[in-house]
Amino acid sequence: MGDGRVGGGTNRPAWLQQYELVGKIGEGTYGLVFLARLKQSHPHAAAGVGRRGSPIAIKKFKQSKEGDGVSPTAIREIMLLREINHENVVKLVNVHINHADMSLYLAFDYAEHDLYEIIRHHREKLNLPINPYTVKSLLWQLLNGLNYLHSNWIIHRDLKPSNILVMGEGEEHGIIKIADFGLARIYQAPLKPLSDNGVVVTIWYRAPELLLGAKHYTSAVDMWAVGCIFAELLTLKPLFQGVEAKATPNPFQLDQLDKIFKVLGHPTVEKWPTLANLPCWQNDQQHIQGHKYENTGLHNIVHLPQKSPAFDLLSKMLEYDPRKRITAAQALEHEYFRMDPLPGRNALLPSQAGEKIVQYPVRPVDTTTDFEGTTSLQPTQAPSGNAAPGNQSVVPRPIPRQMQQPMVGMSRMGGTNMAAFGAAPQGGIAGMNPGNIPMQRGAGAQSHPHQLRRKADQGMGMQNPGYPTQQKRRF
């Protein structure tokens, strides 16, 4: 981990000498995101990764609100990302801290795109749907990465299109990376209450058990979000666009529930036995008493036949009862992924031979801003690429960006010195070979992975990624 010591005869931290700054590519509630390039290759650099000139996204965190330590959001990301390693999870390359002002910088491999921008490009520029092969490949890879996280007892808790990055260049072209672990948590069995963590998951992708105040929840909340993302890939617009209530730290989200009920119908205790135990269920009953929700038909909104494998998978992701909701491991075994077109490692390939690869837009780079966030650099030519881990666009967007930011109300840890967390050097991470997660067989209802006890010897290693051999033509 780089420190904040001054080097090179300047008043800038020595670790900055590793990078050639290109400019700022994003800004959010957490801080700033910069695009930089490596000046020298890493000792264990792989082909196209960690070599001289390789693009790197550097995420600078603001100080904690208390002003006496490192941002707790950054601590969460570091403690999880330094322990996990998978092809479909964003890779933490290095951690740097400037002791002078306790500013923290996380360096990631740079991804040129994210699902939010890909969906927006098809909706607003091309006016064409995303081809079935790309939709299936993006979804398969998302589930593959999520299965790895859930197998290691990690709940992401903030899955949404802007947090799903897509590589646009090099050997990893078309590979997705799950990013932004600021709200992620490790969960255990027996489950401990997680409600004290505050509001989680951006509202359009928030599971009904969270909206109804569940004190205990599982990785099933991530699968609901995946279902929402799947529908958005199919229709190019968010499935449940509720208006968020913000009157109190954790208000009753009636409008969001209303949007869900209008599509899926009203949940019942018969189909969801634990529904009556949820704290906000009585509030819901009072608000909608006498209101009849006619099931408008999810298949009509996503334009899928009710008997199609795609609709069956989507319906199982959007199951009200979290205990019955399909898991990532089960979803990977679904018939939908066994049918043509088969999913592949490069999700951005054309669906048919002879078709052109879609050229997705380049994110503007502010080349006048330095690492401290001040305006000082001379403008340079903007590089290709448009996304970075957890970034926020510098371009106005038609869909409200509050839906793309972490939720307000999350509990915060006190300011903390990094040394207390034993943040080790990241050289080992840089030398790892990402990917290779086993394809787990789907579990039955009686052995649901959400309820299994964590194995004491369970590690976070990697195995075979599980792509069928016939898919090699898609790589």
From Swiss-Prot:
One of its GO terms (cellular component) is mediator complex. Residues 19-337 form the Protein kinase domain. Its EC number is 2.7.11.22, 2.7.11.23. The modification Phosphothreonine is found at T29. It catalyses: L-seryl-[protein] + ATP = O-phospho-L-seryl-[protein] + ADP + H(+); L-threonyl-[protein] + ATP = O-phospho-L-threonyl-[protein] + ADP + H(+); [DNA-directed RNA polymerase] + ATP = phospho-[DNA-directed RNA polymerase] + ADP + H(+). The keyword Ion transport does not apply. InterPro entries: CDK, Kinase-like_dom_sf, Prot_kinase_dom, Ser/Thr_kinase_AS. One of its GO terms (molecular function) is kinase binding. The modification Phosphotyrosine is found at Y30. It is an enzyme of class 2 (transferase). ATP binds at I25, G26, E27, G28, T29, Y30, G31, L32, V33, K59. The active site is at D158. Residues 366-397, 438-475 are annotated as: Disordered. Keywords: ATP-binding, Kinase, Nucleotide-binding, Phosphoprotein, Serine/threonine-protein kinase, Transferase. Residues 366-393, 466-475 have a biased composition (Polar residues). Induction: By auxin. Down-regulated by cytokinin. PANTHER family: CELL DIVISION PROTEIN KINASE (PTHR24056), CYCLIN-DEPENDENT KINASE 8-RELATED (PTHR24056:SF495). Belongs to the protein kinase superfamily. CMGC Ser/Thr protein kinase family. CDC2/CDKX subfamily. This is Cyclin-dependent kinase E-1. The lineage of its organism: Eukaryota, Viridiplantae, Streptophyta, Embryophyta, Tracheophyta.
